[in-house]
Amino acid sequence: MSDITEKTAEQLENLQINDDQQPAQSASAPSTSASESEASSVSKVENNNASLYVGELDPNITEALLYDVFSPLGPISSIRVCRDAVTKASLGYAYVNYTDYEAGKKAIQELNYAEINGRPCRIMWSERDPAIRKKGSGNIFIKNLHPAIDNKALHETFSTFGEVLSCKVALDENGNSRGFGFVHFKEESDAKDAIEAVNGMLMNGLEVYVAMHVPKKDRISKLEEAKANFTNIYVKNIDVETTDEEFEQLFSQYGEIVSAALEKDAEGKPKGFGFVNFVDHNAAAKAVEELNGKEFKSQALYVGRAQKKYERAEELKKQYEQYRLEKLAKFQGVNLFIKNLDDSIDDEKLKEEFAPYGTITSARVMRDQEGNSKGFGFVCFSSPEEATKAMTEKNQQIVAGKPLYVAIAQRKDVRRSQLAQQIQARNQIRFQQQQQQQAAAAAAGMPGQYMPQMFYGVMAPRGFPGPNPGMNGPMGAGIPKNGMVPPPQQFAGRPNGPMYQGMPPQNQFPRHQQQHYIQQQKQRQALGEQLYKKVSAKIDDENAAGKITGMILDLPPQQVIQLLDNDEQFEQQFQEALAAYENFKKEQEAQA
């Protein structure tokens, strides 16, 4: 940091000297122009923008909490925490709208990077025009940052060069620095000054690289251009006895060489690969075409375009993904998933059970680290017809005293996606179901019955704080905030309670259907209470606990009872539901 400070001070001194040497008249002209520009800019902001963007927020932050933080600095017209449209979970940012520009400016000065709920927030002016938001003329990119440098430290470093609109260090999923960041200056000239002063300097002992930010589409375009006109090639499978002279001579026949080098270890021994840089692209392309696969000193050479590390990683990732998809396609429809296995069932017994239905290529019971059965496994047949026959006949069949669950095995991501879609569909029809429940309760003569808050797909157990996806939005007409359906004696304006516009029954059910319905609800409520206790003991997030309970409770009651009695089966189902819930949240955040 001291190196940067010294250079910055030196730069400022040089600027002052240059200003003193200029004639007074020429100095005054740009000053007037600058002041007019600044006044125009400020006037524009004052007239059009008293709204702040507040980012990096803790998921539990509410509008009320933000009001307590921001209201002391000036009158606020509105606050909105941006939330997922389905789950109502916070997206981690909000908008605070002041009634005047000065209050917003003061908030940025005093609260930017201040901790809210233990997490430093990031504040900047909200820009409604997408064209201006995407304009990157004053945006710079910094890499090789020390892990200790955060948003505030980066802002303090670069604010000496001019007004900073926003500043951000990229973080991974665990909140750790990824070693690079961005600083957006109001003026492009300030960005250029910062690049000139800081690029190559030391920050916390690390030499940083600073340059103008290049949009992704431009980077990809330049990369494709570089690929098409490469001059640097990579060579491997080189005999370790090969000398530098032999290596250069092998490639010099194709054109003029800028450099040719064999990579060596600390002891000076060749590593078996090297690089050759040609002057002309055509020479490099010809060398790749003629020498790739050719034997040199009894070894087949690999010769190809030299790639950057991230390119190689991306290529390997694509190869792995292609291999994975090919493997999945190969086993599509032939691999069965079997659960509710007795602990006595091992691989051989599992294979024996399914052998009558066709040729089995593999059968495996999944086990934990201690070798104990997890209660589920997989059987792979040689054809989809055999697998379908086995699934049809073995599903719900009693084996070792337990009914088997047999289904076609699905990939985790497919299962999670299906669960997420089911959650969305249930959520959309939940309000209609709630109305029907209220109508049935009213028809059954149950005045003042408490309608519990809803889980993702079901009613929450009584006495537990299950989340209600609609609580953060406006209440429906005639629905009291406390979730109670008031008793009939309160509808007539009696003084013993507040008046509500009641919701009349929409359907009249026969008495025996009402009793059956009520019995079902009692059973679901009892199971929900027990499930919620087990789920909430494994996860601290009440919102997630409620939704996971709802997903599990959507299973048939008999299966839910089995889960409550069997901890291993419960653990498996819990992990699947948790993974589906997390995947659903990520998908919604990506769409937003």
From Swiss-Prot:
Keywords: Cytoplasm, mRNA processing, mRNA transport, Nucleus, Repeat, RNA-binding, Translation regulation, Transport. One of its GO terms (molecular function) is RNA binding. One of its GO terms (biological process) is mRNA processing. Residues 21-43 have a biased composition (Low complexity). It holds the Pfam family RRM_1. It comes from the Eukaryota. It is found in: Cytoplasm; Nucleus. Residues 11-20 have a biased composition (Polar residues). Residues 507-586 form the PABC domain. One of its GO terms (cellular component) is cytoplasm. InterPro entries: Nucleotide-bd_a/b_plait_sf, PABP-dom, PABP_1234, PABP_HYD_C, PABP_RRM1, RBD_domain_sf, RRM2_I_PABPs, RRM_dom. Residues 1-43 are annotated as: Disordered. Residues 1-10 have a biased composition (Basic and acidic residues). NCBIfam families: PABP-1234 (TIGR01628). Belongs to the polyadenylate-binding protein type-1 family. This is Polyadenylate-binding protein, cytoplasmic and nuclear. It comes from Kluyveromyces lactis (strain ATCC 8585 / CBS 2359 / DSM 70799 / NBRC 1267 / NRRL Y-1140 / WM37) (Yeast).
